[in-house]
UniProtKB/Swiss-Prot annotation:
The gene is ybeY. Binds 1 zinc ion. GO terms for biological process: rRNA processing. Keywords: Cytoplasm, Endonuclease, Hydrolase, Metal-binding, Nuclease, Ribosome biogenesis, rRNA processing, Zinc. It comes from the Bacteria. HAMAP family: Endoribonucl_YbeY. Zn(2+) binds at residues 120, 124, 130. GO terms for cellular component: cytoplasm. GO terms for molecular function: metalloendopeptidase activity; RNA endonuclease activity; zinc ion binding. This is Endoribonuclease YbeY. Belongs to the endoribonuclease YbeY family. Single strand-specific metallo-endoribonuclease involved in late-stage 70S ribosome quality control and in maturation of the 3' terminus of the 16S rRNA.
């Protein structure tokens, strides 16, 4: 687990899967720059990269649905709400889900898709929803804007070296 210094929000990143190599510092950079782009202040964010079995088990525990999914978000403190420490939430991401979704891919395409899953979870923490077609359209637009910004700043996920 890697943690940023205390002058920044604490970004807790944990890679608990072995399907895809994840550079933990790239995950931290993605979260920090996303928060800056969205102008969100928080004390803590948690991101866990899990294998399919662990994510399906969490899906069952949280939503009584044992099916595979790509990401689960557990928002904790809403942005702008006073709490200390302010914990924006927890993101649980399956890198292997990106492999299944893409089927054939380059390394860059794979890490872009996994980055999308992290951004998707972060947007849920900010209150975005994807229950209706209009909500999905708005969320997809925000994902695309965020991913473009992150790519420009070389802040997408990358493999560990």
């Amino acid at each position: 687990m890697l943690i940023l210094d205390r002058s920044s929000p604490q970004i807790f990143i944990s890679n608990e899967q072995q399907d895809v190599s994840i550079d933990l510092q790239s995950a931290q950079r993605l979260v920090v720059l996303f928060l800056e782009l969205q102008k969100v202040s928080t004390d803590q964010v948690y991101v866990y990269f899990l294998d399919d079995t662990a994510l399906a088990q969490l899906h069952d525990e949280q939503f009584s649905d044992p099916s595979l999914t790509d990401t689960i978000t557990l928002p904790i403190d809403k942005p702008g709400i006073a709490s200390f420490p302010h914990v924006l939430g927890e993101a649980f991401v399956s890198p292997k889900a990106a492999m299944r979704f893409l089927e054939q891919y380059t390394e860059d395409q794979l890490y872009h898709e996994i980055s999308r899953y992290v951004v998707h979870s972060l947007l849920h923490m900010l209150g975005y929803d994807d229950q209706t077609d209009e909500d999905k359209r708005i969320m997809q637009e925000q994902e695309d804007v965020s991913l473009s910004f992150l790519a420009e700043h070389q802040a997408l996920l990358r493999p560990a070296v």
